[in-house]
Amino acid sequence: ALAEAEIEYAEDPCHSIYVKFRVTDDKGLLTPMGADLSKTYFVIWTTTTWTLPANVAICVGPEFEYALVKSGDEYYVMATALTESAMQAAGKTDYEILGTLKGSDLEYMKTAHPFIDRTSLVIVGDHVTLESGTGCVHTAPGHGVEDYDVCHNHYPEIPIVVPVDSHGKMTEEAGQFAGLTTEEANKAIAQHLEDTGALFALQKIIHQYPHCWRCKKPVLFRATEQWFC
């Protein structure tokens, strides 16, 4: 384990991945706009593909505007302000916005995890920004401080899943990816998403990522039980 003061940031190549989570309960708000729920998806964005087995929620900004976007025979939910860049990342030029809703309206909609038999609940959080991605934040409280805080403090019913062990390998909770290192899981998960049609877009980018100040290797964040005396 590392203290916060022992973490430094360095440039790291990674995949910028957009993933489709199919809507299973729209609270009766998307279908009146013309959406076919069997083909309607929240599109999340992440640069840590290996954390997707830990996803239990999708977080949106309560005051942001979100669009229902139609392209071909599919429908996507994403922040209106990021629609153009997200569709461009997917190479989609022919699309239309059917309607908009506030992020707070989306709270408690339900989606299906793309490769694990589990519901990913739509929640709201003030940490969501419109700087990049889709405004629909992949939420894995087992692997992120902000994710943990919003779920632990406001949605205690959401489970905290940590499918990575202390050696940096995926556990049985990661399903078919059990036994892989996180680096191996990045590639395997991206390939599986593409094979199953759940991949919206994939790009290679360079970003700032936390590294250990001693060994200079990327840091993995895990929620673990703690004891204090």
Name these PLM-found stretches.
Residues A1-P53, E65, Y108-A112, R118-T119, ...:
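Residue patterns forming the tRNA-binding/recognition surfaces of aminoacyl-tRNA synthetases
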Residues A57, F64-C136, V145-D149:
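Protease-associated
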Residues V60, G91, L193-G197:
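Generic secondary-structure transition motif, activating predominantly at the C-termini of alpha-helices
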